[in-house]
Amino acid sequence: LSEIIDTKKIGDSQIIVTDGSRNDVDPFFLKKDYFKSFIRKQEEKVFIDSQMVVGCSCLEYDKLFTLQNQPLLNVGDRILYQNVGAYTMTLSPLFIRFFPRVYLKTLNGYEIIREEWTVNDLKQ
């Protein structure tokens, strides 16, 4: 689960920045798209030709996927990824940011089973 933290329009392109990274969902950097769904704060009626969804690392390989002719994603909207993350606990580097929260899907929804790391966790 990642959240949209910023959007930028650059020329004809719409860049959508998430608080997640490709390290979180594809540590081998092989996939071009993911099984995903969107949790929107409000229904968007404006469709955008192309939206490039990128991670928070600002590295050129941190491009997650591109949406074509889809409703505009806005700050606060969330992306729920499915069938990813099996190796991210062991392969994600502590580069640029600490380990993210880990959620467990339960019968009643989602439960946080590990909070995002802080400096104190790194010093253990």
What are these regions (language model features)?
Residues 1-124:
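Charged (often Lys/Glu-rich) extended helix/loop segments that serve as interaction or gating elements
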